[in-house]
From Swiss-Prot:
Main location: cytoplasm
Assembly information from the UniProt record: Homodimer. Binds IgG and collagen.
Record gene name: PRM
Coiled coil: 26-852
Gene Ontology cellular component annotations, sorted alphabetically: bicellular tight junction; myofibril; myosin complex; myosin filament
Region ranges (Nonhelical region): 1-25, 853-873
Protein name per its UniProtKB record: Paramyosin
PANTHER family: CINGULIN-LIKE PROTEIN 1-RELATED, MYOSIN TAIL DOMAIN-CONTAINING PROTEIN
Amino acid sequence: MSSRSSKYMYKSSGGAGDISIEYGTDLGALTRLEDKLRLLQEDLESERELRQRIEREKSDLTVQLMQLSDRLEEAEGSSETVVEMNKKRDTELSKLRKLLEDVHLESEETAHHLRKKHQEAVAEMQEQMDLMTKAKSKAEKERQKFQAEVYELLAQVENTNKEKITIQKTVEKLEHTVYELNIRIEELNRTVTEVTAQRTRLSAENAEYLKEVHELKVSLDNVNHLKSQLATQLEDTRRRLEDEERKRASLESSMHTLEVEIESLKVQLEEESEARLEVERQLVKANADAAAYKTKYETEVQAHADEVEELRRKMAQKISEYEEQLEALLTRCSNLEKQKSRLQSEVEVLIMDLEKATAHAQNLEKRVAQLEKLNIDLKSKVEELTILLEQSQRELRQKVAEIQKLQHEYEKMREQRDALQRENKKLVDDLSEAKSQLADAIRRLHEYELEIKRLENERDELAAAYKEAETLRKQEEAKCQRLTAELAQVRHEYERRLQIKEEEIEALRKQYQLEVEQLNMRLAEAEAKLKTEIARIKKKYQAQITELEMSLDAANKQNMDLQKIIKKQAIQITELQAHYDEVHRQLQQCADQLAISQRRCQGLQAELDEQRVALESALRSKRAAEQSLEESQARVNELTTINVNIAAAKNKLESELSALQADYDELHKELRVVDERCQRTIVELKSTKDILVEEQERYIKVESIKKSLEVEVRNLQVRLEEVEANALAGGKRVIAKLEARIRDVEIELEEEKKRHAETQKILRKKDHRAKELLLQTEEDHKTITMLNDAVEKLNEKVKVYKRQLNEQEGLSQQNLTRVRRFQRELEAAEDRADSAESNLSLIRAKHRSWVTTSQVPGGTRQVFVTEESSQNF
């Protein structure tokens, strides 16, 4: 960003010395400048009034001279009165000379007073320029500070990127540890499957033993006298059945609660997925709104810049038109002055014109040398600007190539993001039955809410910035309108003043023409009286006039050649200025394009960082989801194995219960049969005592067998319970270990997420600070451009005022030359009057005449002239 300062010099040379004025680019001193210009205009108006008064007095003096000449003509008859009249005329002429000297002194005093005021104004302007330079140095220091802050922020961003890389490395290490833990979990799953296989084998052995027991029970069908013992066994089995039914009911209730919890988790996961989709839609909408605001603001800024450029072009066209009109008026004035100079037939005026022409030629030569120097400087500036333009174009091409690379990377990242989103959707569909996803979803929802709040804050900030930009734009438009109104007023005033000046010039020209005609009449009369002397003098002066005309023609030719050279140089300067403006405009456009490309690069970089962050978060969520999926699968497998075992136990118990119920029915039937048989046998007891003894022996044998079988059944049941307890304890330990490991991993994940959130917050703060600094630099750049535009407008106004001052000085110099010329004409007229008086005295000495008048009755007046001529023999 290059700072540009402009300084304009104005030099005017007068009788007292050179006056140099420096105009600086201070917006705050506009009002002071306008007040000073008003004071200068008032001084100029007072000087004009003084000069008008001098011209009136001069016209009065010319009238008095004409009256004196008339009196001289009337007083030719009386010599005594002529002497008195000559004395009176001498006194009047001395008075007139004193008056002219006083007027000249007053005009010099007023000019000296104006120069003093001008020098004071110049001193004040120089003080203002010093203040402006100090303010400019302060602004440059602040800009350097801002640049240093920007560099520090960039260094901080690089440090955050390095920290991000280290965090990625730690995440990769954690992923490796998670992979090792997964391998361990798979090994534990294998051990669990082996335990389940052993359990199934034991259950098969248990079933075989139960079959043997059933066969033994079938062998007990023939026992009829075990009613009481079997009843006790039935009661025991009933109690066991009731206990098992209670256990089954508790297991069914726990299964029902688990199913209800799983269904609620499914519903919550579906709601969270819907909420996440809604949050993503809101994010997309917010991004679209931000992009729309951004595009709208950029289009409005571009339109405003186009309007400002159009206004600048229109102002430049109007200024060029006014300059052409002024040049045409100046050419007209110069033509009028040339015509007047051709009409002037006196030698002294021609000599003065020659001196002026030589001085003007010298000034023009100096100006030509200055213009050549300016031309060389402008050419060097144009070459430097072309070099800068080429450098900026190269940088722009490099930036465009970098932007294309970033866009290509951004598209790749977008494709990866789409693929990850698809995988994420699949994982979300697969993880519909996981418990841990609920906490993750709640945390994500909270993070999304924070991001939504942040986006809303950014949107509010953007809206506030947009409103501020709108207010600034309105203020600038009001300033432009006010400046255009002031320009229109100034233009109207200067047009009115130009018209007044033209009218004054026309009136002066008419007066001078009348005076010239009167003088020509008087000269013609004097020439009629003094032909001989005038013829001699005429011949002498005609030769001088021809010589002077030749020299004047040569000077005019030189002047015309110099004016042509000056016009050519002015055309070249205007072309170079236009080329310079065009190059400067192209440079400005390149700088704007470079700033826009930098902003786009920054936006793309920010989007790329966001996409990287989103990719990392998606990868983390994917890994967490995979872990939770594996854990849930392991838990589901465990639950399925437990359910299978419970179902097998349930089926086993149901089969045992059905077998026991069948045994109970059979025993009930057998009891009835036994009762009948007992009733029969009671009758036949006596006859069957021998059979009873045998049966008692058999009964003792059966009881011994029964006791041995009961002992074996009890041992088997104890072994079964021990195996089931060992299996359940081992599964619970494994589950407890896995749950503890899952909790540790979740805690580590939460810590990593917190760290990541903190780093993201720091990055967002740094990005926000960088954006604020960029906005401040852009606003400073805009204010600098606005100040430059205002300075250019002020410079144009100052140029117009300079031209007016130059014109006023030229007019004052012309009026002074006219006064001097009229003084010379008066002196020449006095000399001629003296010569005429001497001639009259000679004529009167030669011829004496008496004038007698007589009144004839009837109203006629008779004049008798008697002449007496004296001749010397």
